Amino acid sequence: VYHIYNRGINGENIFREERNYHYFLSLYAKYVFPVADTFAYCLLKNHFHFLVRIKDVHEFIPDRVQNTVRDKNYVSRKFSHMFNSYAQSINTAFNRTGGLFETPFKRKKVTAEAYFTAMIGYIHLNPVKHKFVKSPEEYIWSSYHSFLSNRPTKLNRD
C-alpha cells in the first residue's frame, strides 16, 4: 500500500475549475484503476493524495498484461501517463507551458495497519486542515462520502 501525493509546481493550483477535478478523476479511472485498488483520495486545488494498493499482475484489468510481466516500470508509467495527460490539458486550456506538478510524484510505503488507518483519516481531513471546509462531509472532491456509503463504488472499502 502506498500514499501517493503531489502538488502544483511552486504551489500553483492544479485544479482551477470544477471540470478539472472531473477530468483528473476520469484519467485516474482510465490509467490507475486497472492497476491499483484505491482506498482513499482527496483533490485540493493545489495538491492531491491517494492511498492505493498496487494489484498483482494477474489482477490487472486486461491491458497488454503479457507485456507487464517483463516491464517493472509499467505501473509507474500508468501514473506518469495520467499526470502528463492532465498537465497537457491544463496547459492547453489555460494557455500555459511547462510542468504543472512537482516531479516526480511522491510515494510513501504504508506497511503498518495503524499507519494505514491514520492515512485514511489524514487524507479525508486534508480539506479541513487547509481550511477549505469545517468538516470532511462538506468537501466533495474526496472519497469521504464513498468511504462511508454502502453504495457500489470503485473505492476499495475492505
Each PLM stretch: what is its role?
Residues 1-45, 53-158:
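Short Pro-Cys-Gly-centered "Cys-loop" motif that presents a nucleophilic cysteine in a tight turn
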